[in-house]
Structure formats: C-alpha cells, structure tokens
Amino acid sequence: GSSATEILSHYFPGASIRHIDTINVGSPVLSETSPLWVGLLQNRPEINFTLDEGSATLCFDDTGLCAVTANEGERWKFGSDGAGSCRFSRQDDDGSYVPVEPAGLCSASARPSHQSTVFGIPRKARSYRAGNLRFRTSPASGRYHLSLELGIEDYVRGVQELPDFWPGSSLEAQAIVSRTMVVRRLLDVGSAAAFNDWELELCACHLKDDDPE
C-alpha cells in the first residue's frame, strides 16, 4: 500500500510535510500547552454539564477564584444569577438547581482534577475526556458559549473520520491533514486570550466541533 506521504502527495500535489516545531517561531500560540478552543455550544441561555467520571474544579477566569469542586455523578449548570453576575448551580435530589457561592463575572471554566475526568454535555449527548470547559458570553446576545480547551494532539486523537480497520498509513495521513488544519486556524486567529468581539460573538472558539472542514 501507499505510505502516508504518498497519499498526501496524491491529494495535495506540491505539498510538503513540516514538523510543527519548525513553524512556531514567532507564533506563541503554538507554544501553548492547550491552545485550541473547540466550540461545543453557542448562544445558550444557560450551559448544562455533568461529571461522568472523576472530578473538576469550577473557576471564574477573571479572578482565578475557584468556587467549588464538582464530583462524579453530579449535574451542574452555569448561567446568570439575575443580578449581573454568573453562578454555577448544582442539581439537588429533587431536580432543582441550587446556586453555589460565590458569584462572579461570566467568564469561567471547569478544570479536570485528574486526567481521567470525563465531562458530559447533555444537549449534545456527548462526553469529553481531554481539556477544560470554557464558558464565555456573547457580546451581542448576552447568551453563553461553551468551548473545550485542549492541545493540538488531543484534538487530532479525537478526530475519527476513518474506521480503525483502515491501513495505518491512511490514518497517519488523516492525522497530518487534521493537524495542519488546526495549526492553520491557530495561526490565523491567534491565542484565545486575544479573541476579538466577532470571535466572541460567533462562538468563543477557533473552530466548532461540527466544522465541515
């Protein structure tokens, strides 16, 4: 069978393969441990999530204050407290949500306590093992976006367009294409810390998880 390089040469004539370390000079975003924000939900009145495995620390990103620990099996939501701030709320046994102290500005995160932590997003019926959940507000609508912050290789491992029984060279070629697209997007947009109003309004992300590319 063809090698990964031969496959890529067939579909992308004239293209060459470079290691990511050779293109990150002058591009600090590629040196970050987890530079990529993948949009999971956009413009929601609130964000619901679960701890399917492990635990996570819930934090307000503007101050770095971590409000509480979310434990395995718990259901949470993030949204407005009705007084100009945001809160995390935990679902009680009767199904109601109980806000936890303190409130904070509406830029927040859920940070895994362990590598084995798994977040569930009920609205998408999906779970996510790698990365931090990031909650951001749309400047236009005031509603909430949810993004998954993760490393480039974590994202590439999560891409499964080809079945596992395909030749290893095909899977390798797919990984190279996926990595290239992510790096290109990171270079175009830059660090999440520098998202402009348009990017914050759209999704607070570099790409959406249903991006057709």
Regions picked out by a protein language model, each given a short descriptive name:
Residues 1-213:
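Conserved, single-site charged/polar hotspot
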